Amino acid sequence: MNISNDVSLLNKKIVYDLTPFSHLDFQDHLSCIVWLSGCNMRCSYCYNKDIVFAKNGKMTFANVLKFLDTRKNLLDAVVLSGGEATNHNLISFCKEVKNKGFKVKLDTNGINFKHIKELLDLNLIDYIALDYKAPKYKFEQITYSSVDNFEKFKETLSYLININFNFEIRTTVHNDLLIDDDINSILDDLSKEKYKGKYFLQNFLDTQNNIGNIKISSNKLNLENIQDNNDSIKIQFRNY
C-alpha cells in the first residue's frame, strides 16, 4: 500500500463513534472503543442498529489518532468494533495505533478471513473476540447472510486455533432464536476443533433499538442442560 492510499484511508469518515474509556471491553486493559460503520450481517438481536446501517461515519481514523495522542499513559489499548470492523481496511490505522504504543483488540464475526489473516501476519492485533453466531443449520436464520459465510467464519476459527492466537469466542443468546441444543452443537464443534479457551454466552440485551425489534423472550435457556464436559473450554456467562 502506498503513502497516498494510507492517507486516503486515514481520512475517510468511516468511524461511527468513539467511546473514550472502557475497563470492560478488553480484560485487564483500559481502552477506548472505535465503532466502525456498516456490517455484513443483519442479526435480529443486534442493538447497534444505527451503526450497522450507517453508510458513513462521523469521524476519521486520523481523528482517532489525534485523540490517542491525548491519552498516552491513560489508556493502553484500542478496541475495534462495529458493525463489522473488518469491512474496512484496518492495516494503516492499526500500524499507527501500534506505533503509538497501544494494544489492539478486534471484535469480529470472522467472515473476512483474508483481511484478518493480513492483520495477524503483520502482528497488528493482540486479541480477538470472535462471534460464533449459530450452528451452521441456523446461521442464515440468525445472521441474514449466506450460509457460505459460515465456512468463512470456520476458516478464521480454525486458523486462530492452529496458530495458538490469544482469542475468545462468544455467542449472543436470544431464547426464541437459539436453544440449549444449539449451544451444545456449538460446544461439540469447538471440541472437534480442539479449541482451548473462554466461551462466553451473552444474554440478549433488551434495548429500544435492535434490528429485529425483538423483545425479551418468555423462554429461558436452561443452563443445566449446557454440556460442560470439556475442561479445555471455559464457559462463562454475561448478562445472566
Positions of PLM-derived features:
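Auxiliary Fe-S-binding modules of radical SAM enzymes
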Residues: 1-24, 173-240
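N-terminal [4Fe-4S]-dependent radical SAM core
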Residues: 1-35, 42-53, 71-72
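Electropositive phosphate-/nucleotide-binding environments in soluble metabolic enzymes
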Residues: 33, 37, 58-61
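A secondary-structure boundary/capping signal
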Residues: 35, 81-82
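Hydrophobic adenine-recognition pocket in adenosine-nucleotide-binding enzymes
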Residues: 39, 85
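Conserved alpha-helical substructure of the radical SAM core
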Residues: 49-79
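Flexible, glycine- and charge-enriched loops at secondary-structure boundaries
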Residues: 54-61, 146, 150, 216-219
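Conserved AdoMet/S-adenosylmethionine-binding subsite of the radical SAM
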Residues: 66-76, 86-216
